[in-house]
Amino acid sequence: MSSLTGKVKGRARKIKGDADIRINESTENVGLVIRVMTAVVDIKFPSGKVPKILNALESKEIYNGKKLVLEVSQHISDSIVRCIALDSTDGLSRNDEFIDTGAPISVPVGRATLGRVFDVLGNPIDNCGPLTKSDYSIKPIYSEVPKLTDQKVTTEILVTGIKVIDLLAPYLKGGKVGLFGGAGVGKTVLIMELIHNIAKAHKGVSVFAGVGERTREGNDLYHEMIESGVINLEEKDKSQAVLVYGQMNEPPGARLRVALSALTMAEYFRDVENQDVLFFVDNIFRFTQSGSEISALLGRIPSAVGYQPTLAAEMGAMQERITSTNRGSITSVQAIYVPADDLTDPAPATSFAHLDSTTVLSRQIAELGIYPAVDPLDSASQALSIDIVGEKHYEVSKEVQRILQTYKSLQDIIAILGMEELSEEDKLIVARARKIQRFLSQPFHVAEVFTGTPGVFVSLEDTVSSFKDIVEGKYDHLPEAAFYMVSNINEAVKKAELLQKEGK
């Protein structure tokens, strides 16, 4: 490779090695590109002046309309570092200069971020201009987990207005929730409904991290928040949400770090403003997937099913920061894609250990046309105990699960021999189970535009009392169809009367 001339100002010297490179000896620690492999870039610095691991490097030149930022991931020698690109490396060539910023990737935090949309580096991407400098500070995306003595455990239920969740797998304020499901079973719709139901009623701040999902969905969510008043375009400081996106089209480095950028913004509101923060992530699997891509490019030997060997450590480093402290709380709702509907896949399986509640979406239930397609038997919550939800709620939920479990165990017999071979008691259980199954469905606000059915928010008291009446047999005389897509038992009775008039 020929010597670099005309690019580097000031006194320069040659660095011995595999390339004839001239390195700047000014106050800036400048390195030169020696290798580009898609999202991974090798940079050569003066001997002994390699940047620290996780330091951000910034290009001197402009690529695709902006400066390119790299993150140091490995030290190859005493002068060469291997970096992850946080944007496209199109146009990058050998001998291009990068400056060591001397610090990790940092993002803006503070009230100036409210109502804005950011990328992984904290740059506004909503065409609303730069941030007001007086209203924000800069914070690195890496921070320590709160000390055990500073953490706080809460036992307060977070009411979502969604019957199947509130009854069978309730969420805790300050807890971590996982929405598990395969492709196309309704994870994003469910998380958007939760944002609609919780964020609107929530007095604190909501932070949304779009990790490797569709740009269209991010755009839809932004406009949904504007329409609902969660984001106020006229007076940004009255907004209640911050959006941080690293979408599907972006390189793996951006998708890997965007969750940490969003989490850093959420931590500010918890630790400095002492607020209760809602933290939504869609999708945690893409966080794992991008880590796997980077790991392969860095030359690490893959672990089980091709995932990175550091999967558990990366997941733990992020999840342990999502916690409640004496100053405030972070309640996290995370959508988690399940590859091939296999919950034992290492990516979703690694997430289980960190969660307080798991909501599992089932393709079999979706095929029945029951939405949300939550599996009432696979979903679970640590909050479902007498001490937290009370005796009435606990007993009703356990009876609902018992009836559904019995129905599930009888399905093979029904398929082979038919309903006629069942005992009268089993026939009654099957009839109630089918009513319960349909009553667990509910129209969503965010799906109104597609279904034409107005969405409903069901109070916890209505949910518990309605299911109590069903399991006690008070409404055995109503047809199954009356229980489908209604809010409470009174609506089911009205629907049954309407169906009778129509002769159905």
UniProtKB/Swiss-Prot annotation:
Single GO cellular component annotation? plasma membrane
Protein name (database record) = ATP synthase subunit beta
Q: Does the keyword ATP-binding apply?
A: yes
Give TM segment ranges. Answer: none
What SMART domains has UniProt attached to this entry?
AAA
What Pfam families does this protein map onto?
A: ATP-synt_ab, ATP-synt_ab_N, ATP-synt_VA_C
Task: List keywords of the entry alphabetically.
Answer: ATP synthesis, ATP-binding, Cell inner membrane, Cell membrane, CF(1), Hydrogen ion transport, Ion transport, Membrane, Nucleotide-binding, Translocase, Transport
Q: Which residues bind ATP?
A: 181-188
Query: Which reaction equations make up its catalytic activity?
Result: ATP + H2O + 4 H(+)(in) = ADP + phosphate + 5 H(+)(out)
Family, per the entry? Belongs to the ATPase alpha/beta chains family.
Q: Give the membrane topology.
A: Peripheral membrane protein
Origin: domain of life: Bacteria
List the lineage, top down.
Bacteria, Pseudomonadati, Pseudomonadota, Alphaproteobacteria, Rickettsiales
Q: What does this protein do?
A: Produces ATP from ADP in the presence of a proton gradient across the membrane. The catalytic sites are hosted primarily by the beta subunits.
Compartments, record wording: Cell inner membrane
Gene name in the database record:
atpD
